[in-house]
Amino acid sequence: MSSRILYVDDEDDIREVAAMALELDPDLEVRTCASGAEALAAAAEWQPALILLDVMMPGMDGPTTLGRLRERPETDDIPVVFITARTQAQEVEGFKALGAKGVIAKPFDPMTLAAQVRGYLKP
């Protein structure tokens, strides 16, 4: 059975590279969104096993999107991992305090992204 991954990033190129890299793993099923608002709808409808969420997006940023996901009963328990260039220890701890399961550094290596995601899917 495959694990559903929702990848959210406002940058088309990054979103496409991430989706292609993740789809190389036959155990991952991937959908993408370009905004926090799209992510809220997709998460409620599709119920992914994990959401990979860009921190800095126009409109609704990653932390705001995470907060909205946590407010809704249908999405409040979906794990979220932030994708960000902001990886200093205090920032990472701040993201975890908001409810993120972890952080993947941006830019990421497309060849190791699926392995990182699998690590977050483990119970």
Task: Give, region by region, the residue ranges found by the protein language model.
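Two-component/phosphorelay signaling modules centered on CheY-like receiver
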Residues: D12-R31
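Acidic, metal-coordinating helix/loop segments flanking the phosphotransfer/catalytic sites
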Residues: T32-L50, G67
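Receiver (REC) domain active-site loop signature in two-component systems and cognate sites
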Residues: M57
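Short, glycine/charged-rich "phosphate-handling" switch motifs in NTP-dependent
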Residues: K101
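C-terminal output helix
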Residues: F108-V117
